[in-house]
Every structure is written in C-alpha cells, then in structure tokens.
Amino acid sequence: LTFDTFLGPSGDKVTVNDKTTTSDVSIESELQKIEEKAAAMQEDLSSGELAQQEMNTLSLQLYQLWDNELNSIWSRLKETLDEDTMTTLTQEERDWIKTKDSAVEEAGKDAEGGSLQPLLENDKAAELARNRVYELAEYLK
C-alpha cells in the first residue's frame, strides 16, 4: 500500500491510503487497516476537543480516506472484471454517485450556510463511501 501523510487538525500525522500497489494484501486486511484509521479519526471527531473548523477538516479527511479506497477498488475492478460486468457496474456507479450527491446535500440542509454544514455533509459522504467500498469489495473476493 502507498500512503499520503499530512498533518491533521490537532497537528498529528494522518496517513490516508492512496492506492494499493501490491496484490498480495487481502481485501479483508486492507479494509481492516482502513477501518482502524477511520476509527481513530472518528474518535478524534467525537472527543469534544476540536474546534468546528478542525472537525470540518477532519471529517473531510475521513471522507477522503473512504473515497480513496473506493477509487482504489474501482481501479482493480476495471482490471479484473469482464467487460459486460464492468459496463453494468459502471452504470450502477453513476447511479450511486447521483444518489450519494443528493443524500449529502440533504444531510447539510438543516445547517445550510452554517459552520456545521460541512461536517454534516462530510459525515454522510464518508458513511456512503464506506458502504460502497464494502459493496464493491465483494467483487474482489
């Protein structure tokens, strides 16, 4: 695995999975590592110690963690699935993106224009991306 490292809101180093570069890592162990990173980020979000802007930034990083994993899995699916399956899956993915975008927008409506809006939207995006990661990972098992 390759990782991007950057400083999180509290100054701690945060490492985000960028893409998988070795095929000997099982999808289960790969997802376990992502879950561990996500849990640490979620713990920081729930700590009550971060300012709103820090929470917004960290929630975006949590979404990016899952979105990067989703993109990594998608790249591998393009290499391994037959053309018909990939065509069907591509249409499903387009539909999923529309649904996700609507759900994310809806999640932020109650706080529209406020400092809480990004947190609500990022949390929903992370939740949906995580769920989609697990759906797509089934094709790699």
Question: What are these model-derived regions, one by one?
Answer:
Residues 2-141:
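N-terminal alpha-helical modules
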